[in-house]
């Protein structure tokens, strides 16, 4: 946390997220806006049960509103002031993560938690 109580976060995009973000067509400007939004309120997204802390947030395409939106899933490690951007997908490609995807992401989050604790 910065002096004056302002929250800070380092953002880490896993390679799969980076590919998905670009494939959806989001811009660097939209990524910066997402990062600013999550820095202000890192627990904004809905918590996805059984994933070890994954959250899902709606992200609107510029000029198309929330109806033409995507979902970004991330995990916030507040203690380490780090947010991992895990996955992104369009609303029309799927509504939610599958059970298998949630299980895989939980394993990834467990590995990330372990690696953070060792730093």
Map each language-model feature to its residues:
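Compact soluble domain cores
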Residues: 16, 25-46
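A generic structural signal for short beta-strands and their flanking turns/coil linkers
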Residues: 13, 34, 53-55
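Basic/aromatic recognition patch in beta-strand/loop cores that engages polyanionic ligands
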Residues: 44-88, 93
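Preference for short coil/turn "hinge" residues that link or interrupt alpha-helices
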Residues: 5, 19, 40-41, 76, ...
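Enriched for short, Lys/Arg-rich terminal
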Residues: 76-119
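Short helix-to-loop capping/linker segments positioned immediately adjacent to catalytic or ligand/cofactor-binding
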Residues: 22, 45, 117-118
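Arg/Lys-rich, positively charged N-terminal/basic patches that mediate binding to nucleic acids
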Residues: 1-30
């Amino acid at each position: 946390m910065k002096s004056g109580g302002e929250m800070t976060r380092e953002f880490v995009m896993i390679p799969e997220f980076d590919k998905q973000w670009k494939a959806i067509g989001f811009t660097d400007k939209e990524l910066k806006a997402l990062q600013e939004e999550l820095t202000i309120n890192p627990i904004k997204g809905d918590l996805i049960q059984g994933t070890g802390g994954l959250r899902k947030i709606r992200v609107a395409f510029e000029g198309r509103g929330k109806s033409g939106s995507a979902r970004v899933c991330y995990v916030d490690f507040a203690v380490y002031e780090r947010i991992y951007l895990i996955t992104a997908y369009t609303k029309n490609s799927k509504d939610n993560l599958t059970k298998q995807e949630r299980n895989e992401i939980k394993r990834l989050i467990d590995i990330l938690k372990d690696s953070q604790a060792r730093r």
